[in-house]
């Protein structure tokens, strides 16, 4: 069976995210280790790191992964932005390492000049340099397959394969698949044939063994739209059947499958629970789709 979970808030400190995950009956967890909309990050106090790791151990929630800042763009051609992006990603990788996280999910980037190939080269070379600077690192970099908005890279399996080739197939680089992004990028998950063809192609081009995490999101937009708009499970263009197939696919048994669906926007002063009602509803929907042995 997959390990279900969600992306949860770190408001109040990193250990509070683990509290929220436990209250929400999550088996796995994704967090930001800093504000996703800022370059700078506060230093993590040793006592907060220790408490977070103890909370994870105590609750048995695993794996825990982080998602990187949306500002980072390794495909940027401008030297200043590229240098800032490399430094920021390196810092986030170090933070994830200190917290004992399995992986750091990252959007590959958007090329700002030149061609797709130029952008993929910059991403791959940048990642290779960051990994070489951290030869003893254990936290994986997880390339997230994207919807392909604008000049975003990573929406074709071939893009991921090219980046992996540029890091010499490092075992420290894996893949995160997002169901909304797959559909938006043109991969048909809605029919039996489309589902099987999608994962056959992924295996042929990238390798199923590279897949370490799934993001489970329905899509507000149809197949091939290349528009990234997440929707609640079963309420969008995917419907329930693709999730039923995925949750019961033995090739992905045991992998974390994490919600990034919309939250109920409730002011902090009015919150009475660590459990987001929409997360709870979406998790119940997913659990009901899992076939019991």
Q: Where do the protein language model's features map onto the residues?
A:
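Alpha-helix N-cap and loop-to-helix initiation/capping positions
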Residues: 40-48, 76-88, 114-125, 151-159, ...
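Histidine-acidic metal/acid-base catalytic patches
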Residues: 161-293
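N-terminal pre-domain/capping segments
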Residues: 1-68, 72-93, 289-293
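Acidic (Asp/Glu)-rich catalytic clusters
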Residues: 19-26, 44-65, 92-100, 128-138, ...
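A general structural detector for well-ordered alpha-helical segments in enzyme core domains, enriched
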Residues: 17-20, 48-55, 88-95, 119-130, ...
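Active-site acidic/histidine proton-transfer and metal-coordination neighborhood
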Residues: 74-174
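Active-site beta-loop-alpha junctions enriched in small/polar residues
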Residues: 7-11, 32-36, 68-71, 109-111, ...
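Conserved, mostly hydrophobic/aromatic
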Residues: 21, 67, 85, 96, ...
